Amino acid sequence: MERRTFITLTGVAGILAAHRAPAFAQGSKVHVVRWVDFIPEADVELKRQAPEASKALGAEVQFEFINANDLQPRITAGIQSGSGADIFQMLYNWPQLYANGLVDVSDVAEAVSRAQGGFYDAFDAAAKVGGRWLAVPHSTGGNAVAWRRSWHAEIGLTEFPKTMDAWREAGRKLKAKGKPVGQALGHSFGDPPTFAYAFLWSYGGAETDPSGKRVVLNSKGTVESVKFLTAFWKDACDEGGLAWDDTNNNRAFHAGEISATLNGASIYIVAKRKKDTIKDEKGEPLWQDIEHAAPLPAGPAGEAALYVPFQHAVMKYSKNPKLAKGLLTWMHQKENYGKWFEVNEGYSVGAAKAWEEHPMWAKIDKPLQVFRRAARKTRMLGYQGPATAKATESYSKYIIVDMYAKAVQGMKAEDALKWAEGELKKIYEG
């Protein structure tokens, strides 16, 4: 973003022109809560930038990093109590759910979008409510199936299966060799829902019709998807995945316990950065045996993907909303955002399209290139309807994830679907 835009947005043109920091009240502070990143160096970079931002803004900048599964409880508690962090990281379309507690940040968001090639469509669905930006789009977490090249070669495969049926057959052979697929299907923010929703869509299933007002989950495609996953789970998967969160599959892959898993780029990146300690069964660096396939293998209705849009929202209860917006503007300046972006190596990609052309993409390893345009391909929670607060509520209650989890634990496919349909009707039609 141009410096002039930054000055205009923060309303401190005269002060910065005089080479002084903005004159916020003495002791002013902006507190940002984000997840603990799966790329540790990304958090290190933000911590490094905090003093620079503090100097630029003339106020203290504090980053706090917490487990991603604790973000929603903290956001809810802050809104209910009227106190807490000034800025929260938002995932998916959470701004829809918390709209009444968020500041309009359209001035910041629109300036970033104009300067950086426009935001991806997913962010309009995620962070715009009633035509207003209630969070500033920050990045997208893509996902892909990380898979062991050598293990798949043992069963005659040189590329990853293209269809769910082919993946089930490959997984069956690998599980028989003690090398199962590993899939998180517990209550966790990322891997379970990004798998479950994409899987549902690949069979033609959806929560609602395009209006978002009528539940249409009970369909032939959904029933088939539940039945297939039940068989896939038994034939191909590590069945302990029912209790996994977003960290378990990373650890299992690095430990050589699973052959493939849907994940972001972190399994590869961390394995390479810790090549001296993360090794395969032959004692060689594990990263050399990792490939990525994206999106998930196709179901009867084709391929589908759910990636994770990230945004930052300023809370209405904040005593320093102008300062908070100033920080978001500063964070999105090209030189500041670019340093954070490069550290990620494709794990988190830009929210704006200009970052697809960043020189980093010419330098990073081929398995990471699959994430370059990930944000163009994602659907949003609520598909095939709009990404409303009701869609976020459904996600937050893990209804689609639990439909599959109940089935793989022994509930009849039709009964698991009926349960999920009933829960969705309480939200969408109640």
Regions found by a protein language model. Give the residues of each.
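N-terminal secretory signal peptides and thylakoid transit peptides that target proteins
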Residues: 1-13
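Short, well-ordered beta-strand elements
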Residues: 27-38, 60-64, 86-87
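Conserved C-terminal helix/tail region of periplasmic/extracytoplasmic solute-binding proteins
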Residues: 29, 60-61, 100, 153, ...
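Short, polar/charged alpha-helical segment
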Residues: 39-60, 400
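Hinge/lid segment of periplasmic solute-binding proteins
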Residues: 91-144, 195, 285-295, 363
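C-terminal lobe and pocket-closing loops
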Residues: 93, 266-287, 299-399, 429
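Extracytoplasmic/periplasmic solute-binding protein
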Residues: 130-138, 143, 168-215, 221, ...
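Glycine-centered hinge/linker elements that transmit conformational signals in sensory
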Residues: 171-173, 211-243, 296
